[in-house]
């Protein structure tokens, strides 16, 4: 299954989520950010590639819908409601990601 994680800058939350799946046998994972200065800025190709898209906040889903409505048709978009207060790799962020993703990704 192909998963895409989205936050604002693709430096802390979405990148941490992507790293959780390094070498996972059942998931291919990428991450991107919605803002112009993002490490990797989300593009139509990311959305076309992904089967399921996880956004950290509602504003990320809103931005994707504004910019990529056609590419999102038929896609599952899940809002995780994880605030922008955790640095990359933070243990609390990892625990929160695991907790929120467990309902959506049974093989995590």
Regions found by a protein language model. Name each.
Residues 1-108:
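Short polar/charged helix/loop
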